Amino acid sequence: LGDNAFGTGGSGTSIVLADASQFPSSGTNFIKVGTEEISYTGVTSGTTLTGITRAVRGTTRAAHSDGATVTNTSDFVAWGEAASGDLVLEPGMWSLDNFGDKAISLIHDGEVFEWDSSLSNATDTRCTIISGAPTASRHMVVSTPDRHLVFFGTETTIGTKSTQDDMFIRFSDQENINSYTPTATNTAGTQRLADGSQIMGAIRGRDSIYVYTDTALFLMRFVGSPFTFSFAQAGTNCGLSGQNAVVEVDGAAYWLSENGFFRYAGKLESLPCLVEDFVFDDINMESGNQMISAGLNNLFGEIMWFYPSSTSSVVNKMVCYNYFDSTPNRPVWTVGTLDRTMWKDSAVFGKPHALDYDAGTDTSFDVVGNTEGRTAYYEHETGTDQNKNGTITAVTANITSGDFDITQDRNQGITFRGDGEFLMKIRRFIPDFVSQTGNTQITLNLKNYSNDTAASSSLGPFTISSSTTKVDTRARARAIALKVENTGSGQDWKLGT
């Protein structure tokens, strides 16, 4: 290479190597010859680097002899540039709570801050680190009504981050968030849990704090002097999947574990779930477990878990349990692709509020070592469609019944279930919608044999409007399943009682 723009008399744009098969061949990459760095954009014939640009990354162009050593520096960074790596860490989640007029906030595995809203200049005052408090903790909760600030997965020696123990609990003196050293005259104290390798999260319940490790559930109850709190194990093999994967409603806690869905209301129960295989066969529990979050929609008695699928690094799916309509023998579950990274119930704003992370939208600033993206803020249960930055998107929904067939026998007042021996004819469908906006689509899926693939009736699917009194179906099969759905914008419906 000569000491000119391309090294070949000013006209060449390529460099020939003895072997370039191990060099990156797509995108903009870099090599180093002597002290000069050169970029290139392609590799041809296994030996030729094309699209070269000399003297990049602040280096100086120089002449190089044939046979000079060429080093691939595509993964190198220049002085002052940010470097990236493949280290996987837990996300920097926050724990938030109130201590009277003070807002308490803890960054995961970090320090705890306070912000006093009662100050006359509160809106002009930054939050400050709480003095005397632990400096590295996984989670934090304010215990009520006794008013202790409790840290989970915290330091055994206050102020020494290297002593952080993921199973260690420390709580402050009553009414004093600056005092954590136990003495004969205060109620501060500590406790280490035994079942599990780390405390995943905690949530305040009606009469206790539910403390979850990765394998078990503990109940932390205020008992007064001399122990301040009691700790009792309430379950095993029921650990919490992620810090925010639990909600409490009406004295019962519901959470998602690596071993299924659970409920605690005085005793541990495994929630019967009709979609458990569907969820757990396609969920990212490796790097995505801390992204799992639970949301409560008490307007409709729904508990939702938002989670990343097995091939996704961001939340992209949802599973929902309806505790209003469920019974032990008939649990009500739904699944979907609603992706929310935060959910706040209607108790605060009157309607649920939630956040949606969009990895495909660039930020206005550079992000190094992670994906760029933006977050949209939604108010739910408003209207019929999704309105994101003025763009209207239909909220589609569907429900399909199980197959039903004709009852063929009746003996002494007992009706026996049909076994598909007879064909049945359905002449018409009479809509029974409690409420309906826009059009709804009805499909009759027909089968003549158990192994048949369900197919729509020849005249279907049928479009039902609010003024439709009946539709003639002229369908015939041994087994029929009813599917109700909406696919367009401005549509919603409620079927039955």
Region spans (language model):
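Beta-propeller and closely related beta-pinwheel folds
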Residues: 76-89, 121-292, 334
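Secondary-structure transition/turn motif
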Residues: 18-21, 51-60, 108, 118, ...
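Beta-sheet repeat architectures centered on beta-propellers
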Residues: 93-95, 197, 237-252, 258-497
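Autoprocessing Asn-cyclization modules and mimics
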Residues: 1-74
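Short loop/turn segments that connect beta-strands within the blades of beta-propeller domains
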Residues: 33, 99, 107-109, 145-146, ...
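Extended assembly-interface regions of large multimeric machines
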Residues: 1, 74-101, 369
